[in-house]
Amino acid sequence: MTKADTIFKENIRRILKEGVFSENARPRYKDGNVANSKYITGSFAEYDLSKGEFPITTLRPIAIKSAIKEVLWIYQDQSNSLELLNDKYNVHYWNDWEVGDTGTIGQRYGAIVKKHDIINKILQQLAANPWNRRNIISLWDYEAFEETEGLLPCAFQTMFDVRRVDEDIYLDATLTQRSNDMLVAHHINAMQYVALQMMIAKHFGWKVGKFFYFINNLHIYDNQFEQAEELLRREPSDCQPRLVLNVPDGTNFFDIKAEDFELLDYDPVKPQLKFDLAI
């Protein structure tokens, strides 16, 4: 069993056994009912990408290309436009979070990246001094939250560090997430930011190192318990999936495309499970 599958099953068991139920929940299902969840706090995982440990489960199929396209929308296009996400990338799952009739998700994610010129600053800082301890992406912007409505960022902070091992430089990343839908979004979010880490590493010709993943509130919604039990019953694939970025070292961050990524040795258990999202 892969490390990701072991962690996935352990977290499902912990939530079902030790978790507590939410109170005064904000999300709603599409039928209007309150989307309560069972949750644990303070979840942490570590993956050594350089040793082939990737945070993707084999217990169900994960839409990795759509996940990577979302990252490009946020950090390359630096956009909150749903039209761009739909037309350029054929990704539609953000449409349920449209703010009014604006055609956007509000001043969130890519809009914050653009507002503060975050990616250019990170690349400039890493170029000037890779060993500085201030390479932080933060999407938590109270001023923007007051400016428009919209879902507050779930994956809101990423930190980068480098390590020299022998003659190689490794880029490590730490993703902090305030809230995570364990069964639906856990591995999507993790692999998105692994992809971002790989893009930055390629930009500088570095190797990818470790990926650290902290989640404050890790939950399973109350309409997902049957799917959770099914995932626990499933036997994972024996293969260790790995994501590769097929571009030369030194490729500009903004020139990398979703098609440049390839997920190898991925043979997830089927059929896919159905989930009704909480909005």
From Swiss-Prot:
What keywords are assigned to this protein?
Cytoplasm, Methyltransferase, Nucleotide biosynthesis, Transferase
Gene Ontology, cellular component aspect: cytosol
Stated EC number for the protein is: 2.1.1.45
Q: Where in the cell is it found?
A: Cytoplasm
Looking up InterPro entries in the UniProt record yields:
Thymidate_synth/dCMP_Mease, Thymidate_synth/dCMP_Mease_dom, Thymidate_synth/dCMP_Mease_sf, Thymidylate_synthase, Thymidylate_synthase_AS
- Where (6R)-5,10-methylene-5,6,7,8-tetrahydrofolate binds, per the record, is at 181, 278
Q: Which residues form a coiled coil?
A: none
What does the UniProt record say this protein does?
Catalyzes the reductive methylation of 2'-deoxyuridine-5'-monophosphate (dUMP) to 2'-deoxythymidine-5'-monophosphate (dTMP) while utilizing 5,10-methylenetetrahydrofolate (mTHF) as the methyl donor and reductant in the reaction, yielding dihydrofolate (DHF) as a by-product. This enzymatic reaction provides an intracellular de novo source of dTMP, an essential precursor for DNA biosynthesis.
- Similarity comment: Belongs to the thymidylate synthase family. Bacterial-type ThyA subfamily.
Q: Which NCBIfam families match?
A: PRK01827.1-1
Name this protein carries in UniProt? Thymidylate synthase
Q: Which gene encodes it?
A: thyA
